[in-house]
Curated annotation (Swiss-Prot):
PANTHER family reported for this sequence: TRANSMEMBRANE PROTEIN DDB_G0292058, TRANSMEMBRANE PROTEIN-RELATED
Transmembrane region(s): 80-100, 137-157, 243-263, 274-294, 515-535
Glycosylated position list: N162, N171, N178, N195, N315, N332, N351, N396, N405, N462
Domain of life where this protein originates: Eukaryota
Record keywords, A-Z: Glycoprotein, Membrane, Signal, Transmembrane, Transmembrane helix
Cleavable signal peptide: 1-26
Key word S-adenosyl-L-methionine present: no
Protein name as it appears in the record: Transmembrane protein DDB_G0292058
A GO cellular component entry from the record: membrane
InterPro entries: DDB_G0292058-like
Annotated membrane topology: Multi-pass membrane protein
Compartmental location: Membrane
Amino acid sequence: MIKINKILSLLIILLIINCNYQFVKADAESKALDIINRYRDIARYTFFTTDGHLEKYPSGFCGGTTIEDCKWDEYIEAVILLSGITFIIAAITLIFGIIFWIFRCLCFGGCKPTHGILCPGPKYDPDIGEGYSKGRVFILKLVTLIMVAGCVAVFITSLKGNSSVTSGINNLSDTVFNKTSYTLEQLIEISNQLNETKYQQFDQKQEIQSQLTQLISDGEELESKGEDISSNAKDINNIRTKIIIVGLVFCMVVAGLIGVSALIGLPRISRAASIALVILIPFMWIVFSVHYPINSVVADICISYDTTGVQQLSNFTNPIIEQVFEGCQNDNNTISVFEDLQSLVNNLLQNATDTSCDKINDACQLAFPRYPNDNPLSVPYQQNVLDCPPTLTCSNTTLSIYLFNTTVHDFNVKCKNAPTCGDLSTCDPSILTEVMSCDWVDVSSVNSCSQGGCQYNQQVVNTTKQIMQLYDILTSLTTLWTDKVVPLIKCSYLMPFIDEVQNIVCVDEVNSLDLLIAPTAVFAILLTGLGITGILGSKRFNSKYRVKGSRSA
């Protein structure tokens, strides 16, 4: 009873884990679809490729055109210009920041606490009630610390998003490369097996080998380029990751310094940190600008509609996948690039079957004189060596019946005047009229005969061995085709790979990019706010310039 309870408890736990996994997976897909829909609805425009006129670009991948008809320059521009505004913000922030700090002491409020808004006037004299009130300084510190807290949150989120994006890109690269390498290894193994001597007798073999050689050559070239692309992509991705991590850390350190300067009153630290933000704020806008268009492209690639019109992530409701992998809606279909190979192999199998059947048909016609009761004085009749089914035609479906269910009639020979069967000493065996068949034996099948069941007539033995040898070649060829080739060329081999890639690109990467894109924009805004409070704090955080005895805000 205790054992049963343990088993039931284990099953319940496994069921809960599976349900949780399915829920998390569905939740991730739902979030990704929401993000994709959000990006899909964003308007895109072209300018440079439309003769200097700002024109709205049609929605969808390549504006809804097929890949062959895509105007890539317009599509790429429309995607890049999505970040045009934020690039401009980054440039303006950088230029204004540099100008601001160059002329800070002259016309942007001055470097010391003074009267005047832009142009600095006389210095504040706290002894006569001039300076910054404690209440206003407190509010400034509070706002600063709130923004620093916000920076901590978006810093953590950005790091997580950046790490997930890196893992996703590396995972995608490995998935594609591993699939290519595995397929190539299988094709090479198939080609090596086809090079065996036993297959050389078939007419189509050379043509099949030629196609396989071409596929392998293309595959090796693709693998080589893919390895380079994969390596370069990982290198660039790792560089991107490190740059972003370093930038995020610097931004967080600077934000923290402004927070510390607010807490303990370090105006010089506040000023230095604010100067550093001249570089860091544009950096964050650039990070945002670089990644923002990516999800727009991903949205074009991944968005789809099912037959009910409900938006979903799926395979062949996706127009790009449908176009690239046309004909693979059914798992049992053959991938288009392998259709010619399949046709050749089918012809080869049919050729092998026909050759085997020709041998069998010849054997079915083979007959020898048989003397009733082995009496040389009796009138002989023609006895077929094989009891071939009269109503069957040899084919790939009936071949096994001929080989494993057809009786073979084996026999010995002797001189007609000899007393015992097998005695050829009393006549000239080359004179057929002086010899006769004897001791006829029924052997259960052609296969049994070829394996030693037939012991007398060497012609019958050789014929059955030839037939079974052809059948063995046909069987090994069929096994090679079924076990090695078919799994590679059928859509059932491709679709799980598409599902895996789609899950990486359309779910994992979309969610990861969103964790990086949105927080970097918020981070840039918060840093801008901290830059302002840091500039204000470069004076107000100095306790010497507060109104003495001030209680008001």
